[in-house]
Amino acid sequence: MKVRVLSSLLLLLVFPACQLAAQATSSTQRFSPPTRTFRFTYTFTVKDIPPEAKRVRVWIPVPQTDQHQTVGVLAVKAPVKTRMTQEPQYGNRMLYAEIEYPEIQNSALGKAEFTLEYKITRREYSRGNYVQLKRTDQKPSVVSASMSRLIAPDSLIPTDGKIKELAVEVTGSQSGAVAKAKAAYDYLFTNMRYDKTGSGWGRGDAVWACDAKRGNCTDFHSPFIGMLRADGIPARFDIGFPLPENKDKGDIAGYHCWAEFYAHKTGWIPVDISEAWKAKQKEDYFFGNVDANRVQLSTGRDVTLSPKQDGPALNYFVYPYVEVDGKPYDKLDKQFSFEEVKS
């Protein structure tokens, strides 16, 4: 099948960057450069496509320009025509492709290769430290209809039962949204450990994480989101890829995620508990700030794609999602890499 490079996507994703709503002040210690500019390459192959397959559908998460990153598309290489879509719940953008019979039979050795290349500038996302944020703290206010989804449960992030009980225990003595979030942050920082041994970790199952008290970034941030939502505080899940702090190029092994919560006077405030746990000297920094050593691809859990997938909602959306004849298909080879460039 012929490879097409969709240069028109340059116009779809490069938007004027907004100004940051708040900058780090001199009293917020910075550990990394405030910006990083790099080429990001997202490559994968759908392999072993059955020759009798009639339809292969592919959804690819696409980073987008916002206050914290500026994204330019350098190239999209795909075996068929793709189109940009956006799901309405969280606003996540994606590329969508369909391979249909007889194109499937004509594909090389039953596989389909996709490569997306970007130039990205990522900026530090800073709201200040806890002392600064506490000055304008208020009790959680009535949530607008547009934010109601962000106080509702997800499949693996309940807001009742054990998570509600934990919220009462951990945050109940605090009144403000910032103070409650800090109590939840401190509890998870102290009581969990970053540990990817064995099974169960990586799904972001808030109840499992509270019982096991270990896991990766999804497991740290799911109970945080659940406790805050149980208190009526909007909270959301962000996911993308990490950039090694002391390297200027190389492969990226897997995803990274963090969280945000909403305070009435300040707006959205980021936290990264798992990174704080791995670098204890950054415990204070990662409440209210996240560094530029990352790129965000999507927001949210229980994600319904556009066009809608036949399978269930996705737990999170950072890797390509593929269906063959209406069923999820996971025979994929994936590779992600970056290279620093001068801005």
Residue map of PLM features:
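Hydrophobic/aromatic-rich core segments of domains that either
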Residues: 222-310
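Active-site nucleophilic cysteine motif
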Residues: 177-184, 213-228
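Intrinsically disordered, low-complexity N-terminal segments that are enriched in acidic
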Residues: 23-126
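Sec-exported extracytoplasmic/periplasmic mature domains
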Residues: 50-51, 63-67, 121, 168-175, ...
